């Protein structure tokens, strides 16, 4: 299955909203881990975004999946970028 990098960009204005929805966001990510979709995720050191490594059938299916993140549903993500990642090349 292809591997994708999913990058979120946040704005400082959404910080409190992200705090409010963080528990649901993390539960959603844990479910992706349980389903073996999410391989790795970590926020950026400056808290301006997050990078995640995921498996998916194609770019569109990954974009559709991440549209259901509680952060996305609450409009707390400034930008989502999904790109296929070819490891080891």
Give the role of each language-model region.
Residues 1-89:
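Conserved, structured core segments of small domains
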């Amino acid at each position: 299955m292809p591997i994708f990098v999913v990058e979120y960009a946040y704005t400082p204005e959404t910080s409190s909203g992200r705090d409010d929805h963080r528990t649901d966001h993390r539960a959603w990510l844990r479910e992706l881990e349980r389903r073996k979709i999410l391989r790795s995720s970590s926020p950026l050191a400056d808290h301006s975004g997050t990078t995640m490594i995921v498996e998916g059938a194609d770019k569109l299916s990954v974009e559709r999946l991440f549209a259901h993140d509680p952060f996305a549903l609450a409009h707390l993500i400034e930008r989502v970028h999904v790109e296929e990642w070819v490891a080891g090349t």
